[in-house]
């Protein structure tokens, strides 16, 4: 059987950029010999000049629903000192509980690129902090997006399933699913109108990305023998989205000159590549490194790097876009 539910918090379409970042620490707080706090910093990489909505979610596993003497802070603002979860589902070894906060006023009060979440707990009864997620949306004229976001708690026994009806049809979209698998023998099967994807060989709380075709619903099913403890697959959140947004396109050409390689690095895309760095690597060692900084659309830079003679060298160009690190490798031999 399945228990619990996921609540649809946000859905829509239009010129909207979105960011969804997760921290999945699976760290035990409280009790004897465990830490009393955990913090994480999320980087704000939205292209939108103003954040329209921001949601913070926290998921924990505990043996009891009584968790006194704890505190959740966001950007040094205390959100709560009481344990009042939105939902708790019972598992074979306790409870899985979720809390969701609208932190839009805090985010918009100060224009910051970093957002800090801190959880403090000095209670006797320990609990496991599994999931901290931050979703932010903002208007951005160059973006075209379609999205739906669910958060809550679902417990799936072996053989049980739950259906999620999407607010509209999605075509060639992605689903980001945060879920807990108790054992490598347990699988989470994601079914849609157009096929199934099996998530397996994973344990603990993880984020999984599933490519979707033409879909109007998701069916989440726990497949497994149940010969493991705990028995339940837990689902914490789902983001289904399709987004079209300007991106950088990095091209690299080179000329060899004895123990050096001269590189021409250009951005032929429609958005800037940030924090561009180029390194040369040979036999597992970094031979040389140069920092280029930002490379705007249409820009190019020429840089010389030292390489190891007589060896195959990897020239790696690294950059960031929307908070994600990307890279391109080319092989050269002097």
Question: Where are the model-predicted features located?
Answer:
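Short aromatic-acidic-glycine turn motif
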Residues: 185-186, 282-287
């Amino acid at each position: 059987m399945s228990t619990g539910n996921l609540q649809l918090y946000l859905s829509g379409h239009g010129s909207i950029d979105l960011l969804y970042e997760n921290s999945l620490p699976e760290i035990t707080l409280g009790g004897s010999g465990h830490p009393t706090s955990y913090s994480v910093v999320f980087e704000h990489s939205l292209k939108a000049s103003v954040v329209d909505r921001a949601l913070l979610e926290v998921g924990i596993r505990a043996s009891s629903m009584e968790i006194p003497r704890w505190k959740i802070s966001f950007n040094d603002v205390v959100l709560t000192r009481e344990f009042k979860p939105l939902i708790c589902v019972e598992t074979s070894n306790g409870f899985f509980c979720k809390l969701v906060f609208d932190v839009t006023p805090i985010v918009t009060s100060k224009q910051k690129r970093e957002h800090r979440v801190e959880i403090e707990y000095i209670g006797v009864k320990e609990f496991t902090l599994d999931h901290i997620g931050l979703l932010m949306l903002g208007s951005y004229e160059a973006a075209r997006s379609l999205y739906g976001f669910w958060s809550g708690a679902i417990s799936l026994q072996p053989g049980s399933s739950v259906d999620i009806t999407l607010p509209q049809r999605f075509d060639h979209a992605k689903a980001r699913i945060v879920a807990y698998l108790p054992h490598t023998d347990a699988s989470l099967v994601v079914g849609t109108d157009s096929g199934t994807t099996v998530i397996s060989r994973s344990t603990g709380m993880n984020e999984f990305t599933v490519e979707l075709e033409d879909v109007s619903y998701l069916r989440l099913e726990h497949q497994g023998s149940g010969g493991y403890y705990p028995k339940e697959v837990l689902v914490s959140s789902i983001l289904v989205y399709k987004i079209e947004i300007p991106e950088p396109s990095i091209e690299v050409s080179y000329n060899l000159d004895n123990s050096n390689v001269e590189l021409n690095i250009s951005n032929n895309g429609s958005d800037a590549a940030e924090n561009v760095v180029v390194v040369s690597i040979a036999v597992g060692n970094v031979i040389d490194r140069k920092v280029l900084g930002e490379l705007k659309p249409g820009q190019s830079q020429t840089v010389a790097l030292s390489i190891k003679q007589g060896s195959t060298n990897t020239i790696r160009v690294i950059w960031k876009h929307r908070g994600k690190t990307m890279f391109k490798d080319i092989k050269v031999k002097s």
